[in-house]
């Protein structure tokens, strides 16, 4: 534990670089990047429930894409549900980095494991999604059970930086899609269908929000580079 306290800044940046590299590796990288997909789709699902709508199905796919099929009355509710995914991912990344900064590493595992369990039990419908959520939950429960401080910190930081980086990357991808293929720009297209506001406008707003939250995360919760010099 003393080693972790004195070296967590270095370990954080090692994990940040590892996450950026590892998540680009086929299969294994996509497996870990699915944690951000889980959070994104959970955002749609939870907002649906908050608005008294119905979550019909959540699907997670091996290519890190996902879908959430919902029922909701009124265009305002439908717009809020379509809007939820990217902001929830960005805010979850912020929350995880805040908890990491405060030393509440176990809380990160508890939160992500709880989200996976709830979605798996109530809404997941496809085989890959069930496989991924099941193995993700088992991995985290083993980490929690053995409670090895360095491994707890390593995985908590790893998940945090994956959600943080993938929230940014996916928002950039959404913006590019809204420019090149506005009819296939995911949530931005869905928002256009409900509000008639062009998909690119929604993509810009979502990207701006994600970058703002990410900037707050960096300036407040990233370990100071000066401590490494």
Task: Give the residues covered by each predicted segment.
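C-terminal accessory domains and tails appended to enzymatic cores
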Residues: 225-229
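Metalloprotease/metallohydrolase-associated module, dominated by Zn2+-dependent proteases
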Residues: 4-8, 12-14, 58, 67-222
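Topogenic membrane-insertion module of multi-pass membrane proteins
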Residues: 1-29
């Amino acid at each position: 534990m003393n080693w972790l306290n004195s070296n967590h800044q270095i370990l954080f940046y090692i994990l940040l670089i590892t996450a950026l590299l590892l998540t680009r590796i086929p299969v294994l990288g996509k497996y870990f990047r699915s944690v951000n997909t889980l959070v994104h789709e959970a955002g749609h699902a939870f907002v649906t429930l908050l608005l008294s709508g119905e979550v019909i199905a959540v699907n997670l796919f091996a290519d890190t894409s996902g879908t959430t099929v919902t029922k909701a009355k009124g265009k305002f509710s439908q717009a809020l549900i379509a809007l939820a995914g990217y902001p929830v991912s960005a805010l979850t990344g912020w929350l995880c980095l805040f908890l990491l900064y405060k030393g509440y590493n176990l809380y990160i595992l508890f939160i992500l494991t709880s989200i996976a369990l709830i979605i798996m039990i109530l809404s997941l419908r496809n085989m890959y999604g069930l496989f991924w959520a099941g193995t993700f939950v088992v991995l985290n429960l083993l980490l929690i059970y053995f409670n090895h401080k360095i491994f707890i910190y390593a995985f908590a930081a790893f998940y945090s930086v994956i959600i943080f980086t993938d929230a940014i990357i996916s928002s950039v991808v959404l913006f590019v899609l809204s420019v090149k293929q506005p009819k296939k720009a995911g949530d931005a297209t869905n928002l256009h269908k409900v509000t008639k506001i062009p998909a690119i406008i929604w993509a810009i707003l979502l990207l701006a929000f994600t970058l703002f939250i990410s900037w707050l995360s960096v300036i407040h919760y990233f370990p100071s580079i000066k401590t490494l010099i």
